Design a protein with these regions (language model features):
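Positively charged n-region of N-terminal signal peptides that target proteins for export
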Residues: 1-4
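Boundary at the C-terminal end of the N-terminal hydrophobic targeting segment
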Residues: 18-23
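Acidic/His/Gly-enriched intrinsically disordered linker/tail segments
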Residues: 107-115, 124, 131, 147-273
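Amphipathic, positively biased hydrophobic alpha-helical segments used for protein targeting
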Residues: 9, 59, 93, 122, ...
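Cleaved targeting-peptide boundary
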Residues: 24-29
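Bacterial N-terminal signal peptides
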Residues: 7-16
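Juxtacatalytic substrate-recognition/specificity segment
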Residues: 30-148, 152, 232-237
Length: 273
């Protein structure tokens, strides 16, 4: 019995390690998910995260490897934005289907973030990888930079997809170039003002590759200003308008790997997962 109590105490210490003593209780969709009687959660913890894994599921079988990816995803986002870690943990949920996502958030998706509640929901299964870098960036950017201004959907999603960094086994830019060759480019003013009405794959990758260019060229500070104040084609970074920067970037963008017709067709059918 004594040995059993010692083991239990050790498990409690391990499960709570890495969290601040003043950690806030889950809120928003995280609190709703934890209170949903249709779901049984395995509770784990790694630095910066309280993790909830659907019991008897695909992610439950691979929970150690999934958890190991989370701290590096947060560090990656922090490095991109050049910020300190969040003071409070992110509540992150692993599930295995879009149907389960609909039950939890009311929408059919494979990844979802609620930055105001520091909540992330991720689908992963044998045919779909978890997009932890994408959704974690949503939370970290939202917490660090605040509420995004007008005409910034492209920046919000571009930053998140830039954090993920790839589509299938290719870079965002390589898939974008293949799509642009086949489907054409989305005009930048349209990306800026009508982002949510564009084809998801093309819009997300075009925004991601452009945001990646902006970060590398100007750093995060001007992007934070765009995020906060809102963006327009004549917004100025480094003495150039966004429109001029985008035109120059598009003309100079080059592929590092070429997709076959079959590889591009598979991505168009399945998506980046």
């Amino acid at each position: 019995m004594k040995r059993r109590l010692v083991c239990y105490a050790l498990a409690v210490v391990l499960s709570s390690s890495g969290q601040p003593s003043n950690a806030q209780e889950p809120t928003g969709l995280a609190a709703s998910a934890l209170g949903n009687p249709a779901f049984t959660w395995l509770r784990r913890s790694v630095p910066g995260f309280r993790v909830y894994i659907l019991a008897d599921s695909y992610p439950a079988r691979y929970q150690d490897s999934l958890l190991a990816r989370l701290p590096s995803a947060a560090r990656h986002a922090e490095a991109m934005l050049q910020i300190e870690p969040l003071a409070q943990p992110i509540d992150l949920f692993f599930i295995e289907s879009r149907e389960q996502m609909t039950q939890l958030i009311g929408a059919r998706a494979t990844g979802f973030a609620q930055p105001s509640a520091r909540a992330v929901f991720l689908v992963t299964n044998p045919t779909w990888r978890a997009f932890e870098r994408h959704e974690i960036m949503h939370v970290i950017a939202g917490q660090a930079w605040g509420r995004p201004g007008p005409n910034t959907d492209w920046l919000v999603e571009g930053l998140a997809q830039a954090a993920d960094g790839r589509c299938g086994s290719f870079t965002n830019a390589d898939v974008l170039l293949a799509l642009a060759t086949r489907r054409g480019w989305i005009p930048f003013p349209t990306v800026l003002t009508e982002f949510r009405n564009q084809p998801d794959l093309r819009a997300y990758l075009q925004a991601a590759a452009f945001v990646d260019q902006l970060l590398g060229r100007f750093g995060p500070t001007p992007l934070k200003e765009l995020w906060t104040r809102g963006a327009a084609v004549d917004s100025v970074l480094g003495g150039m308008t966004l429109m001029a920067i985008e035109e120059e970037w598009r003309a100079e963008l080059r592929e590092t790997a070429r997709l076959s017709d079959g590889e591009l067709a598979a991505i168009e059918t399945k998506g980046c997962g």
